[in-house]
Structure formats: structure tokens, C-alpha cells
Amino acid sequence: DCHILINPHSIEQFLDALDRSPPDWGLVYGHGHHDPALDERLFTLNRERDAKRNGKEPLQWTVVFLWSAELSRYDPTTGGFGMAIGPIFTQTKWGIVRFKPEEVPSNLVVIPEPSTREVLRRQLEAGQKVDIEIAMVGRLIPEESLVYDFSHDEEGLGIIMPVVRIERVEYLLLR
């Protein structure tokens, strides 16, 4: 039984079940990145929320989330494609959510069935960009299940990072 967390609504329901309500980002942010007490407020927020969610059922759920990828090269030895991967950022009423795998293997290879492999090889050889999505399946790491932080790109933008121990990876070709 998996909880599929790939759109704002499903992610918000998941966060509601874990932490009930979003933090008061403005209060935590205070006077911004240069506020000397910001790190301490974030640390306190994360520790308090960790303690409150201890033992909650969603910590045991198997979750599915997506990362994006672009095929980079074909390897004839494996019959598969290397790829460049990265997180998908989802805007929610809680803030921006970016799932964070505990460990991302650096050697992920997509090995499609032969007919698809040839189509993808031709597309790459023609200089076309080939995007796929990576469905990662796993469970939250209870001790660090959600990390609250702020964007380094946009002042005051709250970021929530569910930290997931990955159990399985599936590749989805976008058509």
C-alpha cells in the first residue's frame, strides 16, 4: 500500500497528517538570512516538530514521489542510458516541497526494452533532449522525517524536505 505524493493536494494531505499545520514562516524568518537568530529558530522549529510527530502513523507509510531526469548517454555495455537527475519542486499551501532521498545512487542506469532503446538512441544521436521521471519509493526516516528550511534563491520562501530512505526506483518515460 503506497501513498502517491506527486501533486500539491496529496502532498498537503500527507503534511497535514504529520504536522497538522504549516509553520508561521514569517515568524521563523524574522529579519531574514542575515538575522543572527534565524538558524536557532529553524533548529528549534525542526526539533519541536520532530518530537510532536514521533509515533505518528504516516512515518510508517510507504511513499512514492517523483524526481526529474534527462538521459545523457547510451552505454552499449549495459544496454542502458546514464542520466542527470534532480528534484521536482512542488508549490503547496505549506511552502515549496522538495523530497530528499537519504542516498541517491550516482550510477543509475535506465535499461529500456529493445524497441524503446533504439528510439531513445536515435533521439539522443539527433541531439534531442529526452526527459524521464524517476518514481522513488520508500519510507520517511523517523529521526529526520521532515526538514524545514528557507530557499537560498528567494527571500523568505519556506521549503519542506521530507527525507526518505529509498527502497525502489522506477523510471517513467514521458510521451
PLM region descriptions:
Residues 1-175:
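OB-fold and OB-like single-stranded nucleic-acid-recognition modules
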